[in-house]
Amino acid sequence: MIPAGLANPFAALFGGGTPIDFGKNFKDNRRILGDGKTYRGLIFGSLCGTLIGLLQILLAPHIAPYLAGFIDPSLLVGYSYIALITMPFGALLGDIVKSFFKRRLGFERGAMLPIADQLDFVAGAWVLTFLLDPEWLLANFTIWVAIAVILIIPVFHVAFNIAGYKLGKKDVPW
């Protein structure tokens, strides 16, 4: 989940430029996505998340022996190059889809929508990965792992958003 979880902060950090919706409105006269969803953010967020995943793959064999008493080391060596791309890219797609629906509901950019704001990227990462690499997803995200992710991710998400806000990369701390 680390590549998926870090894709969004990297998108915010390196984003800006041309909005994905090109500044256009939907048929409800509201922006399709808003200025916060840009091509540069999508590209660099996805690339950075993928690079983080690649780093995980490269380090896993070296870290596994030290974690042997805590987790099964074989869990650290099962990787997928498809998931390496789909997890961060899917995370950003999940955020984009959520933004689309927030605009339809009348939420402005930066408006808080609890739970959806924290778990949109998890849903996007899992859905895209399930569509393109279901075997890897189901092998790595058992029901207990999925529950743990759903419970833990919101805490990390809020912490990263507060950090982004304090660094001046986000307009709001959520």
Curated annotation (Swiss-Prot):
Domain of life: Archaea
Pathway: Membrane lipid metabolism; glycerophospholipid metabolism
Catalyzed chemical reaction(s): 2,3-bis-O-(geranylgeranyl)-sn-glycerol 1-phosphate + CTP + H(+) = CDP-2,3-bis-O-(geranylgeranyl)-sn-glycerol + diphosphate
Magnesium recorded as keyword: yes
GO molecular function terms attached to this record: CDP-2,3-bis-(O-geranylgeranyl)-sn-glycerol synthase activity
Major location (coarse): membrane
Its membrane topology: Multi-pass membrane protein
Ranges annotated as spanning the membrane: 51-71, 74-94, 112-132, 136-156
EC number(s) given by UniProt: 2.7.7.67
Cofactor needs: Mg(2+)
GO biological process: glycerophospholipid biosynthetic process
Family designation: Belongs to the CDP-archaeol synthase family.
PANTHER family: CDP-ARCHAEOL SYNTHASE
Protein name: CDP-archaeol synthase
Natural source organism: Methanocella arvoryzae (strain DSM 22066 / NBRC 105507 / MRE50)
